[in-house]
């Protein structure tokens, strides 16, 4: 068992790390004291009379040092600066008696001198009442709700993510959450095979490099590099440079390298293999996702999940591999007039993609959540379909969102990038593109005013002080829909479509509790394939459409995002975590957003989007009830839920009538929720003219010759299903066109 545990520890970056130095949150002692009391209110200790089996959890509290400092550190590092400022002010005011009176009202009054108590002196029941009241505030009192959300989320998120040096957390053990050997035990590969690094021959990890070693490492990989001490840069020459290694970048790099071009891939994240993945929720999120998986829209309404490691989103996606729907292709080819979407070329590209990433159509064994979805649909007479996956039919990994520890999921790091390095491509990790290098275009055969001649980049998190200038004949941006537009805008491009038309596939979640005793469903919510089933809801009467599927949601995320009404209620939710099946409703959005700068995303849903989500939520709840849930609910801030035992049809419909797609944390209403997006598209779309898109039909910038885009930002609108196959197929077509355009030109 100890051998298994050692093998499951994973890469040091994917494990909980002991803090080796002081804190940088900047909170004063009085602010920390106020925050500590708020943390303890969210997760208070209880009496030791609780049943012994979960005693270690029920008596657990969030007051032990250095808990509050860690929470403060996470808030400052990941929270939006405006929200953090609000929190600091409120924490300071709460440290005074009359400040507490101002913010908390009569609940802080006492019969004894000095008659007004500080927040830290209030009994638990009054503190809970104050926090519940803050959660309901809006308008000019919105800062209270923001404080509530920030403190609640990070308190619970950290509590259920911290582990000791043995990767243990008593709270996780108490709720029955155990991942030791979950996927690897079923994997027949030897330890030597697990440790194999498929990209080894072509990868340079700059976190292991310095200014002394980097030139030699590049030269050994066949890359032309010169050290320019005058400009304090490394000048690199290649045929093609690709920024990003996800769905688009991986495919583009492979096609360009196979054509004999010297390709350099820049990836700001790190490289991990199956042996490296720990399966630990928060350490994995912090390393594998953009902004640690904690990126939100400016108003806090959406949480945005986007991959940020070698393989990009394909390293952390949930395996769904769905071809572009025919009606979407028709819309794009006829409505948007992008003809290749309606061509045989695109169909052939989808064929090539599905073959290369090993898409299978069947699932041998469904996990707990998918069993619930299938049974509920069956009992309601609803059609449920199997979801194609880029993994074997017997793949039973419920933690692929933290990297596939079985090594069975065929992301670009296992497929297209392997093809690329086998054909001489080099991947530089820990390198962030800062801007494209644009010069005046003197070509008489091209109307574009600028010409892209490469990328200006820098090392992140390593010991390399000099910048990089990569000179290339072709530059491909595959940084994703959240990062390609800011990169293009920071380079001086001005097309009005850059950064606009962002689509998110908005998601809202429901849950249903299924006690293990006498249940027809086996397993835990985190076991088995994440998405193996789907129900396409299409209400002909209302015209509402949504898809229902199951998510991965780890205990820390579940605790942080679940509605909070009291400490005991939260602990009860967590005890039920393993047998709480989640269903989400996803819609093909008509609304859109903007991303002009990194981490600055705005988005607006339309009335129709909200109607679709509302219908999807109600359908998901019906499915859970039909499957036999004893209790169901939503993520609405007040803890909206319903007991299902002996429920009448009338009572259920009355409950469902109250279910709605309420606004986000910044909404004016009393109730709010958190929306999610794991698919970002359209923020640098193609168009037949510069007025209709930022790129032409070949994926080339209307403003800069030689600058192409191969990622989800290029898509004309939302796909309506997981966009991985669509992005890879589009990148396949575009990169093939790039090769054709260069075939008669001399390589570098």
UniProtKB/Swiss-Prot annotation:
It is a multi-pass membrane protein. Keywords: FAD, Flavoprotein, Membrane, Oxidoreductase, Transmembrane, Transmembrane helix. Its main location: membrane. The chain crosses the membrane at residues 89-109, 140-160. The active site is at residue 679. It catalyses: a long-chain primary fatty alcohol + O2 = a long-chain fatty aldehyde + H2O2. InterPro entries: FAD-dep_OxRdtase_2_FAD-bd, FAD/NAD-bd_sf, GMC_OxRdtase_N, GMC_OxRtase_C, Long_Oxdase. FAD binds at residues 238-253. It is found in: Membrane. Residues 1-25 are annotated as: Disordered. Its EC number is 1.1.3.20. GO terms for cellular component: endoplasmic reticulum; membrane. GO terms for molecular function: flavin adenine dinucleotide binding; long-chain-alcohol oxidase activity. The keyword Transmembrane helix applies. This is Long-chain-alcohol oxidase FAO4B. It comes from Arabidopsis thaliana (Mouse-ear cress). The gene is FAO4B.
